[in-house]
């Protein structure tokens, strides 16, 4: 692909791209773009590797940091956190057992990869659960259909990657389940922050190998 005519480069969710192992690919792509381009980089966190990429590829950049909004009294998340240690070959059975006990009205199940999202969704559906997958490999039409089904209660479980879950408009989730351990504390906090919002109580479960 000839990138010599590129005028603007936008790097969105840069920290997630690095977590997924795309740092070298990102560098290689940026090296092929003109030095005169305009670059915008968006990242929820600013780890050293992101800062290094910014220094190399952004010319006289302006850094804009958005401060966290203060949490109002009574609005702090109230999330009960639980971890279950199981052998890898029993993870799907453990997930099913957690769901049977918790009986969530609406739950987000986080997986690390697209393939795992599809596999876990298929396994849950084969056991009689109403679950849908959402990840970056799906078209916008597919994603919209899945989100509509989740919001209206047609499906009770949404199995997602971290990247796909960012920016989703989901007003209330009763449970968050980490099928895989997140890559960092920030990702963990972002995941479980989907439940227990606006003073509600929520629950977060993590399945640990």
Language-model features, listed with the residues they occupy:
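Conserved helicase RecA-like core
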Residues: 1-209
